[in-house]
Amino acid sequence: MALTDESLRRVGSSASEVHSESVVTAETSATGLAFQERTAPSQAVGRPNLPTENLPRRTPPLLWVSLLLSAAVLACRALSPAIISLPSLTPPPEASLISTGEGMLARLDRLGGTPCPESDFICVTLTVPLDHLDPADGRTIEVVFAVLPAGGDRRGMFVTAVGGPGGSGLAVADTYTAAFDPSITEAFDVVFFDQRGLGASGGQQCVAAAAANYGAEYDPLTAAGETELALDAERFARDCPAEMGNPDLLPYLGTEQAIEDLEVFRRELGDDRFWLYGESYGTQFAQTYAAKYGERLAALILDGPVDLTLSGFEYYAEQAAAFGEVLARTLSACAEDEACLGDMGGDPLQAYDSLAARLRAEPASFEFPLPSGRLAGRSFTFGDLEAGAASYVYSEGSRMLFLRALAASTRGELAPLARIAYDSLSLDPETLAPLVDPGWSDAVSFAVECNDYDYGPAETYLRAGDAVDASVPRLGSVFYGDLPCSFWPEDGFDPGRPEPLVAQGVPVLVLVGTADPATPLPNARRIVERLADSYLVVQEGGPHVVFGWGNACVDNLVTGFLVRDLRPERETSCYGTVIDDYVPLPPADAADFADPLEALASAETEIAYLPEYFYWDGETPFAVGCAFGGTLAVEPSPTGEAYTLSGCAFSRGFEMTGTGAFDYESAGSRLELAVAGLRPGELVYNRDGDGATRVTGEYGGESIDLSR
């Protein structure tokens, strides 16, 4: 489905071995100033039609972000003995090599492999049939695969199909792989690819059409709103193919064609069988491949799976309900946290519903701090609220960020929610112009969806949404994400739904979180029930797509399954949470800080929680307007990151001007600042890699030397 994939940055961390005792106690500890991991919520569905963007998920930059919070101890509790060792899931090692004995580097060289840009991977461009299903059609298309050869004794090939549809595998290959246990990259040639039509495999885009589509506002609960919704979907279905530049590709971008490209790649590499991992939409791809070429799979991993037997209407109805439920669970988790509840000033669910009702009635005017230092008059709408809410319920970290922004709104500050909305809608916060992400394609996203699913005419789609509108109180508009398919060109045939996946002779590991809004838990359970050799791993709470986030239970089960042929019990439960530990908002007035050390530590935390920084790529310089005036600029440095502050204030009365740095090697940070406001001063702030802080200098006419 066109799932609003998080594809989510993950912090790769070494994980302890999963224990084989009957029960492993599930405990966690997490304290500190900031957050444990940087996640990237996707461009999500919060309006009737929002970007379904698949962003990089495993973290490159800002190691200090995770260092500010003590690492949580993520344990695993199996329903019965956690791991059992069975005979090898794969043929003997030599069977995975091509018959000529040719090594991987030699194979890649034979296929014209070259280094992928700014990557450790080797890129191979294959020319494949445009229409695999019609041998008489001689047209071709190029598809790019990226391979990281095994670092040790080769076991075989491990292929990842990323989420979307529309997400680039090449764009995330290095960051995903950094989160793997080293034993995976030692044993496997790791493979990612750009699906036909997107990124390096075609570059098809429709950025302007998508921006217009996602920026439209209407209420599907009213007749007039339904009319506008349908008109906008029709307009997008016309404008997107026209903008993409090669609309003739549209009939050939579906999953049924795309899996044939992978099969061509397998044949060219010469492996008889390989290991396939799919996440979110990638599970749609992986199951389609497994249904046709199951004999070519040594094992299959489905993370955040889609039940392909459901119709589009059935799937989206279940998904819309899940989005609303995860939002409610997020708000309930806030109510159980003293600091979050205090910041919210009352019941968090009521805070959200009250704001939503107010914005439904009338957009709210507010001033947004620009990177230039000026304030811009802006309007915050109900659609903006839903965009941010839907986008930011994908992971524990993003849910906590949304709660902080919602709490700020209860004290009259809408700019934090606006930052989240702009990030969710891929808008430049200063100009509100659409941002181009080369790792994502709306054109391919809808082309795949509209090839894979049949919805019939728009009226049928809208009437199918009536039950959702009546039963889902929050974020039900997610249901309408595929409405453009009712108008999509080259549509008009019903692909039908596939038979349930059998995967005879293929062990299947299925992963899911109980707080997954995009691919709700029932999908995974139904898939597992139909498979004879399948194993379900359920993380309590957790994100959408659970492998690679640093949860030792989940990651070790996957690593053992891949590297050591270890199969878990039929169902295993792993510890997890709905939200990361809540970090309180700073006081609005600097007079409420105990001392300048507390003020500077708070400022460092606030920088970390800016969405522009939270999802920074670590390479592109950027600037933001600070909450109470001034600006902050961030850029990479030879040893880490460099900051420039100019009158920047996150609390009234504590304006900071100067420079700062974060050093990747030591994991320490430093700020050298002149401060103004309540008291003038010249301060130097240091935080070491262990989290100890110190400030020295002069403040309010007095020398200070404070440490904690």
Over which residues does each language-model region extend?
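Bacterial N-terminal signal peptides that target proteins for export
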Residues: 55-63
